[in-house]
Amino acid sequence: MRCLSKKHQKQGDEHGGEIPLPNPDEGTIICGVVRHLGGDYLIAKCLDGVDRKIRIPGKLRRKVWITEGDIILVGLWDFSSEKGEVVYKYGKNEVNKLVEKGVVPKEFIDALSELI
C-alpha cells in the first residue's frame, strides 16, 4: 500500500470513487468548455444545446485547471438558468465511462472538439 500525503488522500476520496452524474432535481447538467472569458469565467456548451456563462468557484480554481474542450458538471443558478458554476471536472477516463453509460452522447464530444 502506498503512503500518500493528506492532500492526495483527500483528492481520491472526494466523491467516494463514483463519478458524479447530472441530476435535474439538483439543477446540474453536463457541459463542454468552449472558451475562457478571463478571470474565473468561461463559456460552455451544455447538453441541452444552450451556451452558458459559467463561473469557476475559488475552491476549484486553485485545485483544478479547466481548459477548452474539458467536460464539466455545472450547477445552474436558481435565479438565472443562463449562468452557473463548475461543480466537477471530468477526466478523460471518466468521460469515456459516461459515454459508455449513455449519459453523454459521443456526438456531443465530437461536436465540442470541432468548436475548439
From Swiss-Prot:
GO molecular function: RNA binding; translation initiation factor activity
Region (Disordered): 1-25
CDD domains, sorted: S1_IF1A
SMART domains named among the record's database cross-references: eIF1a
Alphabetical UniProt keywords: Initiation factor, Protein biosynthesis
Domain S1-like: from-to ranges: 17-91
Pfam families assigned to the protein according to its UniProt record, in alphabetical order: eIF-1a (PF01176)
SUPFAM superfamilies hit by this protein: Nucleic acid-binding proteins (SSF50249)
PANTHER family per the UniProt record, alphabetical: EIF-1A (PTHR21668)
Family (UniProt): Belongs to the eIF-1A family.
UniProt function note: Seems to be required for maximal rate of protein biosynthesis. Enhances ribosome dissociation into subunits and stabilizes the binding of the initiator Met-tRNA(I) to 40 S ribosomal subunits.
Name by which UniProt lists this protein: Translation initiation factor 1A
